[in-house]
């Protein structure tokens, strides 16, 4: 085989060799000649016209990856390449730049008051070390390649802008000075947009005729396979699929506070199956918990009676220190002053409370109101009747614990609702007045919330957003915390003789749950009941008052965005360490396990109520996180019924189309749902029927479907928020627009893990770090 000593290859020589030797022997002989010979052959082989020489693909393509891997190992043994410096190794402090940012803090005065003071803190701007600019550019280029899908001629201006934005974010992350930032952005970004040899080889491997032929063969085979009762995979993807609800995969702890007794009667279980629409889902796994004895006990154990400590053990929730809430009483007095500045607080009538509800819930409250006229309220009416909440939960990363709703009787709710239901908005406005700005953002549509959060962000020179994770807030609402909350209501009705009893009944809770298995679960507890009519209002009062007191105590000037237990603090970057060092311990003394999340320095990365700000056509709006693309494709309604399915698609398409007008990906999914619903005219009654609870808050006063064009600036903002680059956005939108939807659904015993054509890993937030 002396002919292999020639370092030049042509197709005729290869034909001669193949006629005499096997492909494996040929490649082995080339490898034995050394790395130069192998590299020359590999470069020549990948340059072949595979359409013209399919025989070369058949003989050598299956063997190329193995031999390439072997020769790479040989190269490593011959010479160990010098590791390239990391970006941080290429940088040093730029002493020529003396930029500072203003750090605000409160200082105690002799009279005991606190005075706001601004302190200049150095920015610590960096520059590239002498002679290391090429290494710095290479380091940034590598991070860009790992973050972006490098395209060919179809790469547009928006994609280029996204790559440059990534390079700029990297430079901003390391605080590189303006001059070197400009050099790195243009060099690294455009080098990364040029495919390297590895990218070219991988593309040839994936798209050569032989690989395409194999994919075609699989497509032919799929047409002859029955898929869970469907004719083909395409049939499965395009139709609604019904599968059973499930038990949570958790063991029962055996807590003595929970008792199970036999009962002759049993509760009728309404929700036994879930229906999903694979063709429009984003691929995340979604589960719904069934009403079962196992789920009820697990939920009570892990969401009411026990919490996990740092070692993963289940323990009793932390209790507040004695007198822990005394230092927050000033907030109640300030709140009361703001509340009464708008006039006295008036107790409502029973009929006014009933009028607050609609549909089936209104009928239930009308029945409860009728009984109050001849049978006075009794403490037994405050007993809790628990049930498993039917909700769509993402379960890719971790199996969620079932959620229990613990409401009291309609009679009790009507009586306490006379004090709180119609006064709730006014009480929340008083919280805003104490803070001096809009703080409680519930009740605002997504655009109003986006404007409010952007306004808070713009108040600071070097702003950061800090999420406060109040894990299982209701479970941590101790008896002392509830008493503190109730003191706000007592201040509003100091001479009333009924309200104290109604509030005291919330401190000692006796609950039960009737299960379909003819079992009765009984328990007693002293924490917040999630079904109480004042749960939302009470959580906002507690959280806002505690955060206000904490910020005042540590002397940090910060702005709060609140919606119950969802909290985000906005402040100067220099204040993060003080918050991070003290907040958890401060809240733990009051019985709450609060976690300070990592700060974000980009407005689009702020997470509030599972939504993030996106600049849509120059205006900020909150856009739901990517998991909503999957959750909206599942329902406990009977989507196997064509009429119900069309109504649901119409309602979802309308609502999401209005909320996400001009938003990448989200609007495309909504538009396809609306088309599946028949493109019917906007019907407020039909929408209200499908979305009884939150449609008004979501839509605000908007009722027109516009289907606005997605602007390039919006794609970039969406990219910063969710890490989905513009090219992928357009690919997914094209997929949604071409998806086929059938109304002829079927039942399956389970939903496959990868049930959607959009793989779950495609639409997940991807950030630089």
Curated annotation (Swiss-Prot):
GO terms for molecular function: nucleotide binding; RNA binding; RNA-directed RNA polymerase activity. Transmembrane segments: none annotated. One of its GO terms (biological process) is viral RNA genome replication. InterPro entries: DNA/RNA_pol_sf (IPR043502), Rev_trsase/Diguanyl_cyclase (IPR043128), RNA-dir_pol_PSvirus (IPR007094), RNA_pol_HCV (IPR002166). Its EC number is 2.7.7.48. Belongs to the tombusviridae RNA polymerase family. This is RNA-directed RNA polymerase. It comes from Carnation ringspot virus (isolate Lommel).
């Amino acid at each position: 085989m002396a002919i292999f000593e020639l370092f030049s290859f042509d197709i005729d020589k290869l034909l001669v060799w193949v006629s005499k030797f096997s492909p494996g022997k040929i490649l082995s002989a080339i490898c034995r000649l050394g790395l130069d010979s192998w590299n020359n052959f590999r470069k020549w082989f990948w340059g072949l016209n595979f359409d013209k020489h399919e025989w070369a693909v058949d003989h050598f393509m299956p063997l190329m990856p193995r031999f390439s891997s072997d020769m790479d190992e040989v190269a490593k043994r011959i010479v160990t390449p010098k590791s390239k410096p990391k970006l941080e190794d290429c940088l040093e402090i730029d002493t020529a730049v003396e930029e500072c940012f203003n750090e605000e803090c409160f200082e105690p005065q002799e009279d005991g008051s606190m005075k706001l003071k601004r302190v200049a803190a150095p920015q610590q701007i960096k520059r590239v070390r002498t002679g290391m600019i090429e290494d710095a550019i290479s380091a940034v280029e590598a991070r860009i390649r790992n973050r972006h899908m490098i395209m060919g001629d179809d790469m547009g201006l928006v994609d280029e802008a996204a790559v440059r934005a990534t390079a700029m974010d990297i430079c901003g992350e390391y605080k590189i000075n303006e001059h070197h930032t400009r050099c790195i952005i243009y060099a690294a970004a455009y080098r990364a947009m040029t495919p390297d040899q590895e990218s070219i080889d991988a593309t040839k491997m994936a798209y050569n005729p032989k690989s395409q032929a194999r994919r075609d063969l699989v497509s032919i085979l799929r047409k002859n396979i029955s898929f869970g009762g469907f004719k083909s995979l395409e049939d499965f993807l395009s139709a609604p699929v019904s599968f059973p609800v499930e038990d949570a995969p958790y063991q029962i702890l055996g807590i003595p506070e929970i008792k199970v007794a036999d009962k002759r009667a049993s509760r009728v279980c309404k929700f036994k199956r879930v229906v999903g629409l694979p063709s429009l889902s984003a691929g995340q796994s979604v589960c719904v918990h069934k009403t079962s004895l196992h789920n009820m006990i697990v939920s009570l154990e892990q969401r009411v009676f026990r919490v996990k400590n740092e070692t993963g053990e289940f323990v009793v929730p932390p209790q507040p220190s004695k007198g822990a809430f005394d230092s927050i009483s000033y907030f109640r007095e300030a709140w009361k002053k703001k509340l009464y500045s708008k006039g006295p607080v008036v107790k409502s009538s029973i009929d006014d409370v009933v009028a607050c509800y609609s549909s089936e819930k209104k009928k239930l409250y009308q029945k409860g109101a009728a009984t109050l006229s001849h049978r006075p309220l009794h403490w037994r009416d405050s007993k809790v009747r628990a049930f498993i909440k039917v909700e769509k939960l993402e379960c890719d990363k971790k199996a969620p614990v079932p959620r229990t709703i613990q409401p009291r009787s309609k009679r009790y709710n009507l009586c306490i609702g006379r004090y709180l239901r119609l006064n709730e908005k006014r009480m929340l406005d008083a919280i805003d007045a104490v803070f001096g700005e809009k703080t409680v953002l519930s009740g605002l549509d997504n655009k109003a919330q986006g404007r409010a959060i952007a306004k808070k962000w713009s108040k600071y020179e070097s702003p950061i957003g800090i999420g406060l994770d109040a894990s299982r807030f209701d479970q941590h609402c101790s008896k002392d915390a509830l008493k503190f909350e109730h003191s706000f209501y007592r201040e509003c009705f100091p001479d009333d003789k009924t309200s104290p009893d109604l509030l005291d009944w919330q401190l000692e809770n006796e609950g039960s749950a009737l299960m379909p298995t003819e079992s009765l679960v009984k328990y007693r507890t002293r924490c917040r009941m999630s079904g109480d009519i004042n749960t939302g209002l009470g959580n906002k009062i507690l959280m806002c008052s505690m955060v206000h007191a904490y910020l005042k105590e540590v002397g940090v000037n910060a702005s709060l965005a609140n919606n119950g237990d969802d909290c985000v603090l906005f402040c100067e970057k220099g204040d993060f360490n003080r918050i991070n060092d003290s907040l958890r311990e401060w809240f733990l003394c009051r019985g709450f396990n609060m976690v300070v999340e990592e700060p974000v320095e980009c407005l689009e990365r702020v997470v509030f109520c599972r939504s993030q700000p996106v600049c849509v056509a120059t205006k900020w709006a909150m856009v739901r996180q990517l998991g909503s693309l999957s959750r909206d494709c599942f329902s406990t309604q009977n989507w196997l019924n064509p009429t119900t399915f069309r109504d649901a698609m119409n309602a979802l398409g309308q609502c999401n189309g209005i909320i996400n007008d001009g938003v990448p990906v989200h609007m495309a999914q909504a538009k396809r749902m609306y088309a599946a619903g028949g493109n019917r005219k906007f019907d407020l009654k039909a929408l209200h029927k499908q979305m009884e609870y939150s449609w008004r808050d979501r839509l605000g006063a908007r009722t027109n479907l516009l289907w606005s064009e997605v602007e390039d600036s919006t794609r970039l903002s969406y990219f910063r928020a969710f890490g989905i680059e513009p090219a992928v956005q357009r690919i997914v939108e094209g997929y949604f627009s071409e998806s086929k939807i059938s109304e002829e659904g079927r039942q399956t015993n389970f939903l496959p893990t990868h049930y959607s054509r959009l793989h779950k890993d495609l639409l997940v937030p991807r950030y630089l770090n």
